[in-house]
Amino acid sequence: MSTPMIFAIPSKGRLKDQVEAWLADCGFKLEMTGGARGYSAELSGLPGVSVRLLSAGDIAAGLDSGDLHLGVTGEDLLRERGDDMDSRVMLLRALGFGRADLVVTAPKNWLDVDTMADVDEVGHAHLARTGRRLRVATKYVTQTRAFFARHGVADYRIVESSGATEGAPAAGAAELVVDITTTGATLAANGLKILSDGVILKSQAQLTASLTAGWNGEQLDALRRLLSVVEAKGRAGKLATLVWPAEQDRAAQDAVAAFIARGGSRRANGALLATADLFDAAAALAEAGVEPVTVSRPDYVFESRSAVLDRFAEALKSKI
């Protein structure tokens, strides 16, 4: 019996709903195998894949350790696993949802503090005056240390937070906060401001593959089929097909030749073009007297090779 590719998605919350909607848009229906409240599922139309529903943090850990082959989780959680993340996982596709920024914040009433250089100065002064380093409350220890080091800030210490990190300064537990935010509203409500150069990471949900998992041929084939559909759906959203009468094909092809030259492709009595070129191409056809011209949007645009899969396969070979 073959061993399926293990694909993990978030088990609850808005991110779970967004992942399910994304899969459905690609044509894959999530079918629970453990009942409505279960934590395992299958994807209709994609055999050889076992879906696990886990917390976003557990997905990041499972991809890092190799217990999972594939997963969707936040980039912030993946990068928190260590500076050498890229040696253990590969980000295959940014999904465009689950967006949040990991940011450095200071109290609003620190009027002279707007940049990391200002934090460095305040840290020196605070240490000289009190004998203590600035305290930075965060759950994101790895990324905080790396970011502060890149900016040459040394006079601080981490206060690891497990609760509402943004409340640490008001509670007297820290001077600065590094936290994840979508709108900044919660930080502002707690009297904090984001430093002008304090964005550590602009995170979003990532389709991610493990480089430490054991992959066999069948599992790689399942990944290939999944990526083929995902990439075809992504391409389709950027393309449109123009169709014109067969008897006007020569004039039409001449009219759209410039758009074909920069990445479009010819079709029988038509052309597949980038949506960004759609109206300019329609205008060129009208000027050439070609009519009527209809436009349709493809559901999928498949190509024979996946550059992403090729890159992943090469990375796997280098691990052997």
Curated annotation (Swiss-Prot):
Record localization: Cytoplasm
UniProt EC number: 2.4.2.17
GO molecular function, one term: magnesium ion binding
Pathway: Amino-acid biosynthesis; L-histidine biosynthesis; L-histidine from 5-phospho-alpha-D-ribose 1-diphosphate: step 1/9
SUPFAM superfamilies reported in the protein's UniProt record: Periplasmic binding protein-like II
Cellular-component GO terms for this entry: cytoplasm
Broad class of the protein's primary localization: cytoplasm
Biological process, per Gene Ontology: L-histidine biosynthetic process
InterPro entries: ATP-PRT_HisG_long, ATP_PRibTrfase_cat, ATP_PRibTrfase_CS, ATP_PRibTrfase_HisG
Alphabetically ordered keywords of this record: Amino-acid biosynthesis, ATP-binding, Cytoplasm, Glycosyltransferase, Histidine biosynthesis, Magnesium, Metal-binding, Nucleotide-binding, Transferase
Top enzyme class: transferase
Gene3D superfamilies registered for this protein in UniProt: Periplasmic binding protein-like II
Co-factor requirement: Mg(2+)
NCBIfam families associated with the record: hisG
PANTHER family according to UniProt: ATP PHOSPHORIBOSYLTRANSFERASE, ATP PHOSPHORIBOSYLTRANSFERASE ATP-PRTASE
Family the entry assigns: Belongs to the ATP phosphoribosyltransferase family. Long subfamily.
UniProt name for this protein: ATP phosphoribosyltransferase
